[in-house]
């Protein structure tokens, strides 16, 4: 980077953050993000992960810089804080309209706006469970038919950044495997990964780029000898004795249960004390974090959620023995900025269940000595090797998103589906989180003793609280409720419903949550419900749209989208445009035309694609073919007409229901997704001059033949799963945009 560009980048960073960048950050802006970046705790990893990429994307080398940055963090609280910080940077730089910013963590992960603008430069900040599950085509708190869109975008034109590697667990190996599979199988546009670490370099990631910037602050190491039989009480007394009046003491414990107990003991002793962990509603979490910034003479008791990214420093740190990388992160919260020139104290103890012997030996050898961040970073402590991530065969098996049971919803709305029965080949939990880290999302509402009312809104946004699945599963039967995906009614959750990312309701009168303590399953105190927020205004199609018009408009949108995205080979570009032009041919089927006209006055003649929503909601209708999928008919027409297999697949896949495996739903057999063998379709003539004659549909051999053809596309070396999903995404986005041309607020909902 020339001196002029270096000065320009310094101005860029100062405008965003108010601080001058460290030299290593300027180097990243000049050379691009490396594979591995090692920076001491407090050395500016977040700035290094975001602003050099942003500068290269918008200023110096946009054509060589992936258009999406995905910043993956291990905790919801860290993701929230980072999301706010990055938003402030974009606002100060005047880029909020040019660069999208989205949060993929907790309940916010269900917001899918980032999928609708694949051509826009964007930043996704998320937790590893929500992001990696989507990269494996099994997104937590996501709707299965939307999975190919998330997958296609995350594996295309994306710069991944994984922070705090020591907290990723199995997700670290998964992230490495996914990058290697992208390199091996190919993507539509370059996709890269940077891993950042504050400690030693993980094996197999190559040579690290070393960053510096953290002050050479001092911490003195000392051991606390606590009796295992009275551990919590002794630890509480030790914290009280170690606290220096007028300063902050930070206590990091390995167990949420022990953190609750020590917090309660300190509070009972009259100490000013805050409890921080991962299981708070958003507003309460933000309030507590703000309280830590405004106080100095207090104690913060935390779980390992504090290790990563939280901008918090204390004069005294009390920590349980933990793996070395975690210990280094925790020590980084002691005298973090050198605000105590005399140094801080790191006091460690062995929990009742024991700890890592190698870490204990290093700490014992440095008893009473002052250590710096550089010494901690340079230490060589052997740590367990994480289990391997998914292989090629696993990745290919996950590409099939067909439900393994008949319980998924067939609605095209973006809502939760009922649980699928996953086979070992397609379950992804083991590649993402330790079992103890899996969470569901819970909201508390007040309702009648019989349960939630039929019109009770779905939980969303600020009222949702992540809850450990293990503790949720211990609640009495009938405590948790969810909306059934098939009939839309609230019902008690079954054990199979308690899955990562599930959205559940609990009765506020039964307790389980305290605003200053978060998820507290043994608390009987009624929970003050958090406002669910205003319901979204109802939108829908406000005019009749003919089939020919919709197909042409979708092809037009595909042209526009392709013009704004990286150059694809001509054959793939043509396949996307043709699939967009043909995707809804199956709407010519009588079952769909009858559905569009049913209950609506004065429908026009001719084949329709969209119906006009009037001033009043329609009465409920019972479809004669409840599982009907028009895109299956599109596939049958194109296949029988001898069209290109890729075009046929992309047209069929445009709602995410007809992709690899196609089977009857519920009790509909011998129908197949609402289509009967021998059904007739009328002739279709498009304004382009293309004609599709009337046909008799045959479905007897379709499922097996279709799966074989779809798998051949997935396994084609010139396509592969990543490119194929990206092409699916382009057709779907073009369809959404053409439909949006005719959408508006429905007056009856205002």
Model-derived segments and spans:
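Inter-Walker segment of RecA-like/P-loop motor cores
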Residues: 93-141, 145
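Walker A/P-loop NTP-binding motif
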Residues: 33, 45-64
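C-terminal helicase lobe and adjacent C-terminal extensions/tails of nucleic-acid helicase motors
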Residues: 237-244, 261-271, 275-290, 294, ...
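Conserved Walker A/P-loop ATP-binding site and its immediately adjacent core
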Residues: 65-89, 108, 129-130, 256
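Conserved pre-motif I regulatory segment
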Residues: 2-38
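SF2 helicase catalytic motif II
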Residues: 129-133, 138-188
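Interdomain hinge/linker at the junction between the two RecA-like core domains of SF2 helicases
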Residues: 190-192, 196-244
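Divalent metal-dependent catalytic cores for phosphoryl transfer on phosphate-bearing substrates
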Residues: 358, 364-365, 567-750
